[in-house]
Amino acid sequence: MADLQLTDETPAVADDGVWLACIECGETFAPFAEIRYTCDDCDGLLEARYGDLPTFEDFEGEGVWRYNAALPFEVGVTLPEGHTPLHRVPRLEDEVGVDALRIKHEGMNPTGSFKDRGMTVGVRVAQEVGVDRLACASTGNTSAALAAYGARADLETLVLLPAGKVAAGKVAQA
């Protein structure tokens, strides 16, 4: 496996300080030059790498896009997502023996799922690489998120659901 520790060297393929690196052989690729899922050389998985990693001081604002310093774009296809509340759970704090436990209520996202957090970035990446149609096969939250974010991006979206295998609430959600 390749040594992927941070280095001072940013490869020539880097786009705005970001590149893809194979976790097996270390080969590097431009992040948006073409649609690529695995390494051309060894078929290994690719990892996003940064010349300079952002720090917490680089993050401001709310929602998913407050982390845009660590994302490939300033803003995505947004509904907006990620403005979900944290709830105190004093009884659970006592039970597990911690002083300040919070539970994030991801059901408050636009489609009722944490999947919105990834889909806002994913649909934006699809736009960047020139995709004009989106599709997924899912029985739940992914289908709802793709339907919503695909519609927001005005992209043709196809969601495949197995016959008789999806709860009515999930179909309505999508």
Cite the ranges covered by each PLM segment:
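PLP-dependent amino-acid enzyme catalytic core
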Residues: A2-A174
